[in-house]
Every structure is written in C-alpha cells, then in structure tokens.
Amino acid sequence: MNKKHQVASLTINSSIFLTVLVAIIVTIGRSVRAQYYVNPEVTWMDFFYYTDITNIVLWVASICMIIIVSMQIHNKKTYKSFKGFYIFKFISVVGTTFTFLFVFLIFFPLGEINEKYKEVSMYNGIQIITHIIAPLLGLFGFVFTEYCPTNKKWTYTLPLVEMFVYMLILIPLVVTGVYEKYSCTHWESPYPFTNFMSNPWWATILYMIFCYGLTLGIGAGIYFSNYAAFTKLYVQDTNAKKHKIKNNK
C-alpha cells in the first residue's frame, strides 16, 4: 500500500472500530436488561446471531489493521510482514458481506410481509450498523485500500471455516433446545429457518448448501477483485521505481 491507501485504510478501520463498538455496547445492554428485568434465565445467546459474530470478528480485524497500518506508516514495513492479518481481515469482510447480502435478499423482503422479520430488517435500530454500515465499510475498505496478494488461489475458500465453525456450534445448541431456553427472544434458533428439529432434513441441507455456496462466491469475488487491484498497483509502483532509477543515472 502507498501512503494514500494507508491513510484511507486507517480512517476506514477506525470508523469500523467505533461503529461496531457502539453496536456491541447496545447489544450487551439489551442482554443485561433482558436478564435482570425480563427473565433471570436469559443469558448471552443474542451473540449467537451470525451477524453479531461476524461483526465482532470484523471489529477485532479492524483493531489489528489499525495497529498494523500505523506501524507501516512509521516503520515502512511491507505487507509481507503482516500477511496473516490481511488474510484474517479478508475472512472477516466476507462474513459481514454475507450477512449484508443475506438480509438484503431474504430478510428485508420478508420484513414487509411478516412482522416477525422486521426485527432483523436492515433499518431497525443498531441493525443499520451491523447489516449495512460495518459490512460496506469493511468491503470497500478492503477491496480498495488493503491488499493481501498470494499465489495460493485457494485462499478465497478460507471464509468457509468461519461458517463451518458457526454451524458446528449452532446445530447442537438448537437440536438440544439450549438456544430456545436461554435466548432473549425464545425463538427455537437464531433464525427461524435454521430450526433443524422442525424443518425437513432436506430443507436443512439446502439451507447449508446455500450458505456455503454464497460464502464461497463472495470470497472468490472479493479475493480476485483485491488481487487484481494489487497487481495493477504493484505494476505501477514497479514502473515508477524503474523510471526513477533510470532518471537518476
């Protein structure tokens, strides 16, 4: 990244840090209120929404990037020194982009039909942060200001790990009824269509295939867009350096 990209990255990651922090504080406050004033059995199951988890991961990634970019500005270190953190940021961005598209394509239209889905609409309370602001800041910031080039093209499949771990934790909680018992909403699962006990087995499989497929598609799109942008910038920087050396001779 050149100085312009570094400053832009620092600004965007700082914005992500502040906006998601607000969402986290509000969510914690809501859970505390539910536990102490509504139902003492209520715990922190609201944090098992994929939206909340991916936003927290993005928040952590933004903190890492603020530190890394600041070090790059002052110490002139290259991306190679922090390649793993850039890949972590990539994974977090795919996760929040997934939630943005999922809500936009499914929950937003359903919210106009069913009152139950209005709670997760894109414009309701802090959802505007977790469903719109943070995902878009993360997406545009990563694609246009942060580059994690690698010759290993399978890197775009890494976001599947985040989705897999979420499913690995969610399914047992739903099947055993733990989520329904301790969540603030007392829904059977974080999302109605993820209720693996009520839904037909084939519906569950189709849902999982859709989620994995969408994650893979988003990962490929973001990765190769990022890679193309980096390649173009690298060629420009290389040509500029060659031109400078030639003029100095």
Label each PLM-derived region with a short phrase.
Residues G95-T99, T157-T176:
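Hydrophobic alpha-helical membrane-insertion segments
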Residues F17-Q35:
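Alpha-helical transmembrane segments of multi-pass membrane proteins
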Residues G177-F224:
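Membrane-interface transmembrane-helix boundary segments in multi-pass integral membrane proteins
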Residues K76-T96, K152-V161:
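Interfacial segments of alpha-helical transmembrane regions
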Residues Y123-L136:
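Membrane-interface loop-to-helix entry segments
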